Amino acid sequence: MGWADAALTSPVTGLPLLADTAHSLAGGSERWPVLEGIPFLRADRRSLADAALAALDAGDTEPALVLLLGDQDNWARTPPPDEASRRAVVRDAGHISFRDAMDRLAFGAVGAYFAHRWSDPTFLSGLALAEAHWAAPARVFELACGAGHYLREFARAGANAVGGDIVFSKLWLARHWVAGPAPNLVCFDADAPWPFAAEADLAFCHDALYFFNDKPYVATRLLAAAGQGTVLLSHIHNRAWPNFSSGAAITLPEILELFPQATLYDDH
């Protein structure tokens, strides 16, 4: 887990989590699965975590991975992929494309969004924001990192990058097709207690703030994660402006309540 290694904690009890096997973390009587270096720490998915752990403890990595690849967030617009498709994407991961993998995982419109993200104006505006405030951070944390597009850019710039997302399959895609092995990845729910307390020089969140239910809590944790560094939020969405996205956007006055010292830019 790189710089966050010593700070991993249970999202349920807050106890420190340490590796007890090559595929699990333990704290007190709790254990959590780790697949392909990605800890699965969703507090609201305890039964799923236990099922994946049982498979891993039995030496069955593929069934554990197939289980976690079927998990989604509450805003998903498509049904989860069936088990046969999940097994196929695990089996063929070494020789299929990024787009093929997302199709098999039933990403739907999100797959198109990720496939074309490199040229998406909102992605480019996020890059411009990061470049405008870049101060050679040694440690970067990205919340809701998705398939790892920004993580790859941060890692290429020499930062020690850590990404967190609520959907395990997105992190798995980041590891295999987009961000590669360099960034450290954690699967957790940002509306629940965060499973780490380490500080980064830059805390970044793009095109996701409107998805969180407890925005004041998430804002507090982002500020804490940045410590004495910088928090950058891009493509926040303004509820007063028509759009067709999922989530629960807020207005500019509400954004300023969350980040009263913020500098605001028009997202054009």
Question: Model-predicted segments: where are they?
Answer:
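Conserved class I S-adenosyl-L-methionine
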Residues: 137-146
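A short acidic, Gly/Pro-enriched loop at the edge of an enzyme's catalytic core
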Residues: 194-203
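A short glycine-rich, Lys/Arg-flanked "PGG" loop and its adjoining helix->strand segment in the class I
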Residues: 216-229
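Class I SAM-dependent methyltransferase SAM/SAH-binding core
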Residues: 147-192
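Conserved alpha-helix/loop element of class I SAM-dependent methyltransferases that forms part
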Residues: 116-136
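Conserved beta-strand signature within the Rossmann-like core of class I S-adenosyl-L-methionine
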Residues: 228-236
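A short SAM/SAH-binding and catalytic strip from SAM-dependent methyltransferases
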Residues: 202-214
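Acceptor-substrate binding/catalytic loop of class I
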Residues: 239-254
